[in-house]
Amino acid sequence: MTYFVELSDNAEEHLKTHAKAGNKILLKRIYNIFEELKQHPKTGTGKPHELKYKKAGIWSRSIDDKHRMTYVIHDEIVTVLVISLWGHYEDK
């Protein structure tokens, strides 16, 4: 099964900010994770794990030491919605 990866408005802004910063290694890692999400959103690079308590249902994986990708998996519509690509969860 191949998932469709969709970016929230917030995640799109974060991606633009990363692109403007010019860190090609970080951008390559983000795009590689997008490709992994299409095939297996619960495993792969960046130690994916489901968050707990109030954030249950949201998944996270490390992009680098400073930034994490958070996303929601919608199995019923075969879609992964990326919520954030900046900071550590809600750090701004």
Regions flagged by a language model, labelled:
Residues 1-6, 12-27, 59-92:
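Enriched for short, Lys/Arg-rich terminal
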Residues 24-38:
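PIN-domain endoribonuclease scaffold, especially VapC-family toxins
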Residues 35-62:
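A short, surface-exposed loop/turn module that caps and links secondary-structure elements
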